[in-house]
């Protein structure tokens, strides 16, 4: 019997949703950073096994929005819960169930798919705290299963995969065996550049940046020539992004080029231009130009 279905991964910001997706896929498709609210779009990735096909939706973390971009991210995440076959609800070991987790649980009550509670980052906590957290969440919702894992250490993730197959319905193969994502290359390129910016900039700047791929061409030798605009909200942020003697921007570019060459499996030449677009996160038309379509 072949099983297939759509699986959405939800949770508060920075609980490891993208890390888990990348681990299960064996490919780096979702942007990963230690800063919260890193994922901005629903990334759809496809994992095909001998008798199953899983289509993952990696969502932004659900949080209280502060601007139109934040509204887009929360709408995107809550919409993804609807009409799926299985939900993975990720959280971390904690002393109490937070408001963000309770908000997600309220959204889960409006859908019929089974929900697996995944307690991530157990390698960073004590067994006592892990047990306490599982007990706390078991009182909040009737989960189909509850499982502690470490996505970073690949601990217990094989068992999680078995549980996911168990709860998938019988269904067709929606995508070819060799297809691993439905997003375009340009989107992944933009996400890689944004990830490197996140890792090389101070806490104040990263969430005020966006990446727009202006050009992506492959020459006769197979080399990619890529030009991107790195968009920020303030002139002062532009100086921080460029850095002294351009060193910060050079580091973003060099680390992005290395990752892009691994992803594209070809040589890459990348040029990054820093542009100021004041309050772009509250500019609906600009947000849509940058690919954030689900604004209400």
Swiss-Prot record:
Read off the Gene3D superfamilies from this record: 3.30.300.20, P-loop containing nucleotide triphosphate hydrolases
Write out the ranges of the annotated region (G2). 37-41
In its UniProt record, a GO molecular function of this protein is: small ribosomal subunit rRNA binding
Q: What kind of membrane protein is this, topologically?
A: Peripheral membrane protein
Segments of this protein annotated with the region G3: 58-61
Q: Which GO terms describe its cellular component?
A: cytosol; plasma membrane
Which SUPFAM superfamilies does this UniProt record tie to the protein?
P-loop containing nucleoside triphosphate hydrolases, Prokaryotic type KH domain (KH-domain type II)
Q: Where in the cell is it found?
A: Cytoplasm; Cell membrane
Q: Which UniProt keywords apply?
A: Cell membrane, Cytoplasm, GTP-binding, Membrane, Nucleotide-binding, Ribosome biogenesis, RNA-binding, rRNA-binding
- A GO BP annotation: ribosomal small subunit assembly
Q: Where is this region: G4?
A: 120-123
| Region: G5, residue numbers | 149-151
Residues annotated to bind GTP: 11-18, 58-62, 120-123
Q: Which residues form the Era-type G domain?
A: 3-170
Q: Does the keyword Signal apply?
A: no
UniProt cross-references to InterPro entries, sorted A to Z: G_ERA_dom (IPR030388), GTP-bd (IPR006073), GTPase_Era-like (IPR005662), KH_dom-like_a/b (IPR015946), KH_dom_type_2 (IPR004044), KH_sf_prok-type (IPR009019), P-loop_NTPase (IPR027417), Small_GTP-bd (IPR005225)
**Lineage: superkingdom:** Bacteria
Query: Which stretches does the entry tag as region G1?
Result: 11-18
Q: Which CDD domains match?
A: Era, KH-II_Era
Q: Which PROSITE patterns match?
A: G_ERA, KH_TYPE_2
NCBIfam families to which the protein is assigned, alphabetical: era (TIGR00436), PRK00089.1 (NF000908), small_GTP (TIGR00231)
Subunit structure of this chain's protein: Monomer.
The entry's function note states:
An essential GTPase that binds both GDP and GTP, with rapid nucleotide exchange. Plays a role in 16S rRNA processing and 30S ribosomal subunit biogenesis and possibly also in cell cycle regulation and energy metabolism.
Q: Which HAMAP family match?
A: GTPase_Era
Q: What's this protein's name? A: GTPase Era
| Organism annotation | Clostridium perfringens (strain ATCC 13124 / DSM 756 / JCM 1290 / NCIMB 6125 / NCTC 8237 / Type A)
């Amino acid at each position: 019997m072949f099983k297939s279905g759509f699986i959405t991964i939800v949770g508060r910001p920075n609980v490891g949703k993208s890390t888990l997706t990348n681990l299960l896929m064996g490919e780096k498709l979702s942007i990963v950073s230690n800063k919260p609210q890193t994922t901005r779009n629903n990334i759809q990735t496809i994992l095909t096994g001998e008798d199953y096909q899983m289509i993952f939706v990696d969502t932004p973390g659900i949080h209280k929005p502060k601007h139109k971009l934040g509204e887009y991210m929360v709408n995107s995440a809550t919409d993804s819960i609807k009409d799926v076959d299985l939900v993975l609800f990720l959280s971390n070991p904690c002393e109490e169930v937070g408001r963000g987790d309770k908000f997600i649980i309220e959204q889960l009550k409006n859908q019929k798919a089974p929900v697996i509670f995944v307690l991530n980052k157990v390698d960073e906590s004590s067994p006592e705290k892990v047990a306490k957290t599982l007990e706390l969440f078991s009182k909040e919702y009737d989960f189909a299963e509850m499982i502690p894992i470490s996505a970073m250490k690949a601990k217990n993730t094989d068992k999680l995969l078995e549980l996911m197959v168990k709860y998938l319905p019988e269904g067709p193969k929606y995508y070819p065996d060799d297809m691993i994502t439905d997003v375009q290359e340009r989107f992944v390129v933009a996400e890689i550049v944004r990830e490197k910016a996140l890792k090389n900039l101070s806490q104040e700047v990263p969430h005020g940046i966006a990446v727009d791929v202006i050009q992506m061409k492959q020459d006769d030798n197979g080399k990619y020539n890529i030009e991107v605009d790195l968009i920020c909200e303030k002139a002062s942020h532009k100086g921080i992004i460029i850095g002294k003697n351009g060193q910060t921007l050079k580091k973003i570019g060099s680390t992005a080029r290395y990752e892009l060459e691994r992803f594209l499996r070809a040589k890459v030449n990348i040029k990054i231009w820093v542009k100021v677009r004041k309050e772009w996160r509250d500019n609906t038309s600009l947000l849509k130009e940058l690919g954030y379509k689900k604004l209400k």
